[in-house]
Amino acid sequence: MSLCAVLLSRRSDLGTKAERQRHKPSKSLLSRAIALLARRDHSRAELSRKLARHIGEDEDPSELGRVLVELGRNGLLSDERFAGAVARSRSQRFGDARIRYDLRRFGIADDLSAAALAKLAGTEAARAREVSSRRFTGLPTTAAERAKRARFLQSRGFSLDSIYQVLRGRTDPE
């Protein structure tokens, strides 16, 4: 009997895909959480939402809270670290308002968002200028060009003060 025939016969012995899934041992919540955190950092709310989908009928829902506390105690789950990482990575493309919105979507508390954005304080005009220069060249000459750039920067979450500085060609904050 060939190797291919053996593999096919074993696969047919296991039944359908649904039957194979039922016999597959389920992962614990802790191992799922560690696997998710190994890929990228998560906020507590985001990880809780993802893990809640995997709580079985026979599992205690309070186990999720214990897993999150254990991960926090071991330093694997930190909303402060997550907020800082998101703020740093998004600061290359977005303004403070958009970063604040994204952090709120991830379930980060407003005080942690403010602390993460405080580390970026004073850089918004420079970041807006950088984003604008990647998309446009030179200073706008017509009102239509100014409006187009202002809409673009506003859609990226930059403040009006920063937008006006970019449109006027100022390099120093007022």
Give the ranges of each region predicted by the language model:
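An alpha-helical, amphipathic repeat domain used for nucleic-acid recognition
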Residues: 1-174
